[in-house]
Amino acid sequence: MVKKTSGRGQRDLKVKVKTARGRKLSSTRWLERQLNDPYVAAARRDGYRGRAAYKIIDLDDKYRFLVPGARVVDLGCAPGGWCQVAVKRVNALGEKSGKAVGRIIGLDLQEMEPIAGCELHQLDFMEDDADLKVKDWLGGRADVVMSDMAASASGHKQTDHMRIMALCEAAAELAFDVLEPGGTFVAKVLAGGAEGTLQRLLKQRFKKVANVKPGASRADSSEKFVVATGFRGRDEA
């Protein structure tokens, strides 16, 4: 659990960063936010590669899809925080005696530093045979497909929204091809008006679809996460 200070204590502990010569004001504000972010501090303390780890922790605490023995695919997995959480929760290293041992496959366009208990592949998940490769690596179908992907920011909110929704829809299509019936799909979206297509698509394929803003998401961010559970299977939709 990440603890936040409040009231006078929070104001007294806040770090201020002076704007150095050559540093933009926006960069200074970003640095200040990082230095004062309890999730950034917690990630360093807990050994996670980024604050995003606490988003999947929040989501899994509520929906319980990362269970021991689960087979998980993490799309756009760099820098690896979600994979690190999944390794622990699905018992990928077999550290929980008497519990089933899960498997984690992480896919990303960029090469990554290894993560114990996770099989990383440098792959574009939009390739035509990506689903076949994933099922081959897993030795079967996945129980969970998850994505914290976001396209590179353009500075234009609607453009960024459309890009991330296109990524989400592509991720959902891969999930339809690799998920076991009863499986779960989790993906980040940005609010902006074009979520309807994805929602309709998921409601056809899953028994339940929820939209959640984890506590670890920044208050000023338009991001939220779609959690679709109870995959019906392609042929049953």
From Swiss-Prot:
Family: Belongs to the class I-like SAM-binding methyltransferase superfamily. RNA methyltransferase RlmE family.
Name under which the protein is recorded: Ribosomal RNA large subunit methyltransferase E
Keyword Disulfide bond: no
Record InterPro entries: RNA_methyltr_RlmE (IPR050082), RNA_MeTrfase_FtsJ_dom (IPR002877), rRNA-MeTfrase_E (IPR015507), SAM-dependent_MTases_sf (IPR029063)
This protein's UniProt keywords: Cytoplasm, Methyltransferase, rRNA processing, S-adenosyl-L-methionine, Transferase
An annotated Gene Ontology molecular function: rRNA (uridine-2'-O-)-methyltransferase activity
Organism: Jannaschia sp. (strain CCS1)
Chain positions recorded as S-adenosyl-L-methionine binding sites: G80, W82, D108, D124, D148
Enzyme Commission number, as recorded: 2.1.1.166
Main location: cytoplasm
Record flagged with keyword DNA-binding: no
Enzyme type, top EC level: transferase
Catalytic activity: uridine(2552) in 23S rRNA + S-adenosyl-L-methionine = 2'-O-methyluridine(2552) in 23S rRNA + S-adenosyl-L-homocysteine + H(+)
Alphabetized Pfam families for the sequence: FtsJ
Active site per the UniProt annotation: K188 (proton acceptor)
General function of this protein: Specifically methylates the uridine in position 2552 of 23S rRNA at the 2'-O position of the ribose in the fully assembled 50S ribosomal subunit.
CC per GO annotation: cytoplasm
